[in-house]
C-alpha cells in the first residue's frame, strides 16, 4: 500500500536551499579535511550572515516508558526550529549516519533533514536530503 504524504512546505524548502548554499560556501572556502566542529561553527556564521535563526548542539530528549529522558542526543544544527542538519566529516556516509538523522527527525517530530558530509571533493556529492513521514 502506497502512503501519501503532504508535500514539504515552501518555507522548509527555502530553509533547505539556504542550508545547502551555506554548506557550499563553507566547503568552497575551507575544503575537506577539517573536524566536524569547524564546519559547524562556520555554518552557524553563514546562517547569522543570512539572518536565519539556527541553534547548534540542541539536546534531543527521549520519551521512554512515559518518562522524558536526557539521553545525551544532540542535533548538530536546527535551522529556524524546523530543519535538522546532521554534519559529518567522514570518509563516506554509512547507513548508521542516515539512521541517526531519521531518528532525530522522528524524536523531534520534524519532517526534513539534511545529512551533509564535508569530507568530499564536491559538496553536492556529500549532501543527502532525508524526508521523514
Language-model features: locations:
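Solvent-exposed, charged helical/coil patches
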Residues: 1-53, 124, 129-133
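Residues at secondary-structure transition points
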Residues: 10, 14, 34, 38, ...
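Conserved catalytic cores of phosphodiester-cleaving nucleases, focusing on short active-site segments
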Residues: 31, 54, 75-93, 104
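Short connector loops at helix/strand junctions that flank enzyme active sites
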Residues: 42, 49, 55, 70-74, ...
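A short acidic/basic microdomain associated with nuclease active sites
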Residues: 48-65
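A structural signal for short, well-ordered beta-strand segments
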Residues: 58-60, 75-77, 127
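Acidic pyrophosphate-coordinating catalytic loop
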Residues: 64-68, 123-124
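Nucleic-acid nuclease catalytic cores
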Residues: 88-133
Amino acid at each position: 500500500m502506497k502512503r501519501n504524504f503532504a508535500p514539504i512546505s515552501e518555507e522548509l524548502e527555502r530553509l533547505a536551499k539556504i542550508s545547502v548554499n551555506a554548506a557550499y560556501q563553507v566547503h568552497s572556502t575551507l575544503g575537506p579535511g577539517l573536524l566536524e566542529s569547524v564546519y559547524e561553527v562556520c555554518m552557524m556564521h553563514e546562517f547569522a550572515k543570512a539572518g536565519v535563526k539556527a541553534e547548534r548542539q540542541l539536546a534531543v530528549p527521549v520519551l521512554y516508558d512515559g518518562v522524558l529522558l536526557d539521553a545525551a542526543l544532540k542535533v548538530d544544527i536546527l535551522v529556524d526550529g524546523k530543519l535538522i542538519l546532521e554534519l559529518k566529516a567522514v570518509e563516506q556516509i554509512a547507513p548508521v549516519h542516515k539512521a541517526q538523522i531519521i531518528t532525530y527527525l522522528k524524536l523531534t517530530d520534524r519532517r526534513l533533514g539534511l545529512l551533509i558530509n564535508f569530507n568530499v571533493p564536491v559538496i553536492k556529492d556529500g549532501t543527502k536530503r532525508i524526508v521523514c513521514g
